[in-house]
A protein has these predicted regions:
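N-terminal Rossmann-like or analogous alpha/beta NTP/dinucleotide-binding catalytic cores
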Residues: 2-139, 296-306
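Conserved nucleotide- and phosphate/pyrophosphate-binding catalytic cores
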Residues: 157, 163-307
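Divalent metal-coordination and catalytic microenvironments
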Residues: 70, 98, 154, 199, ...
Length: 307
């Protein structure tokens, strides 16, 4: 059996830098490695409707936005198969059959589902489709016989549930489905990029994103407004690097060439961190450096998207 990748995104808005470091960079690397026989990248419009059923136009419009973001980041249609979920109706049929193999209590225990229900303030008014979307994801993965699924850290519970469905199905109907392996981002700083407000996760619904298509001035405004160490009130105060969103972003995006170009007084990023920790380095200077880094990373993506 060949090596097959299945991955994708919900078209509920433009993609942001959390998607970029969390999955898109990894997809491009895997695509260009030549190690896989097939790569399928799904624009999950049917899944997007599970919490946007009253806003179908939003989903419809963002299908193209997501496709443009893919191409701008380096997804190559000659190497990767980009498709729209709703155009493969068999996925919905397979989801229905899998629903008979999963209990309500098991879905309720899924940490990702619980977190997203809380984030959307659904409480008791959870749409059934949204509640069951881990089952839909399992159908997507197994329908294409995916052997590998690149995911962010927050999606690990979904993949575990998929594996449970595979085991259950195979125990009842015989060895039919393929259990997928998981690939996490190789850069550990990218496992979960926080929002610019310091919240645990960057999210379109929370409005705390830097989008891949943001203009230069929008990026600057967002970076300069970023949450940082609340106890670092004066330049001379020692600052906290661990858990500080500005430094998390630098860990995810900064390259040595950016330090050499934008901060020639420092040998490397670690030296900048040590200066911040002992005091004498203001947040504004660090944010200006981060802005330069983000501009250098995102300008080529933005220009490719426009072309």
């Amino acid at each position: 059996m060949g090596k097959i990748i299945l991955t994708g995104d919900r078209p509920t808005g433009r993609l942001h830098v959390g998607h970029y470091v969390g999955s898109l960079q990894e997809r491009v690397k895997l695509q260009n490695s030549g190690d896989y026989d097939e790569i399928y990248i799904m624009i999950a419009d049917a899944q997007a409707l599970t919490d946007n059923a009253e806003h179908p136009e939003k989903v419809r419009q963002n299908i193209m936005n997501v496709a443009l973001d893919y191409l701008a980041c380096g997804i190559d249609p000659a190497k990767s198969n980009i498709f729209i979920q709703s155009m493969v109706p068999e996925l919905t049929e397979l989801t229905f059959y899998y629903m008979n193999l999963v209990t309500v209590s098991r879905v309720q225990r899924n940490p990702t589902v619980k977190a997203e229900i809380q984030q959307r303030n659904f409480e008791a008014s959870i749409p059934v489709g949204f509640f069951c979307y881990p089952i839909s994801q399992a159908a997507d993965i197994t329908a294409f016989r995916a052997t590998t699924v690149p995911v962010g850290e927050d999606q690990l519970p979904m993949l575990e549930q998929c594996k449970e469905i595979v085991h259950k199905f195979n125990s009842v109907y015989g060895e039919t489905l393929t259990e997928p392996d998981i690939i996490l981002p190789s850069n550990k700083a990218c496992l979960r990029l926080p929002g610019i407000d310091g919240k645990a996760k960057m999210s379109k619904s929370l409005g705390n994103c830097i989008y891949l298509s943001d203009e230069a001035e929008d990026i600057k405004k967002k970076v300069m407004s970023m949450f940082t160490d609340p106890n670092h009130l004066r330049v001379e105060d020692p600052g906290q690097v661990e858990g500080n969103p500005v430094f998390i972003y630098l860990d995810a995006f900064c390259k040595q060439e950016y330090v050499d170009e934008f901060l020639p007084d420092y040998a490397n990023l670690e030296e900048l961190k040590e200066h911040y920790k002992r005091g004498g380095l203001g947040d504004v200077k660090v944010k200006k450096f981060l802005n330069n880094v983000m501009q250098a990373e995102l300008a080529p993506i933005r220009e490719r998207r426009k072309s």
